[in-house]
Amino acid sequence: LLAGTLFETRRTAVKAMTCAGFFKTAERARVSIRNTKAGNFLPPGTNALIAFDFVNHGRSAAFLEGARFTPYVAKFLPEVPPLSDRAGAFQWVLSAGETKGYLEPLGLTEEQFKAWQVEKANIFVLGCVIYRDVFGQKHQEDFAVMFMPRGGENGMDTFRPVMMREYWRSRSGSEVEAL
């Protein structure tokens, strides 16, 4: 009788832990970017403003801790895109369903400009946003955006952004990189 009761208690505990895990997954924050725009990266050394909207698609608040943005010029992205050590640290709360705009100044080096101009390489901005959910779990969303020149006037729409979905990835817990 005692063994049966212990077995039932253990099974009930396992079910409760499983339900709690599903609840955390369903209710947690999920942050991504959208509405990306870039100013003019030219001439080299000029800081273009990159505009991103951070969006919380989840069902609870996200506590944004920072982001990393890396300009990268090449014909193709490597399998594992490199992220710079340069990080923007900030403390924001992003409510469920909320969108918040962010501007980051990024520029091309002489070498990157030459690769773009001579080798017809592409301009990418690689990045990640790091945040915590209401359960205290740390998350990181990696992304890559390719900017194609439109020509014409200077301004926020000089380069057309193309989201590189195959480079987007989500990480949690110990997989999250330090800022």
Predicted ranges, named:
Residues 57-60, 72-77, 132-139:
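Short, cysteine-centered beta-strand-loop-beta hairpins and adjacent loop/turn segments enriched
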Residues 71-83, 153-156:
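Short aromatic-acidic-glycine turn motif
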Residues 109-151:
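Terminal connector regions
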Residues 80-112:
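Intrinsically disordered, low-complexity Pro/Gly/Ser/Thr-rich segments with frequent PxxP/GP/PP motifs
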Residues 47-51, 99-101, 122-124, 140-142:
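Intrinsic-disorder/low-complexity, polar/charged segments enriched in Ser/Thr/Lys/Arg/Asp/Glu/Gln
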Residues 140-179:
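Acidic, serine/threonine- and proline-rich intrinsically disordered appendage/tail regions
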Residues 42-46, 96, 117-123:
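Solvent-exposed loop and beta-edge segments used for protein-protein assembly and interaction
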Residues 1-70, 127-128, 170-179:
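Membrane-proximal alpha-helical anchors
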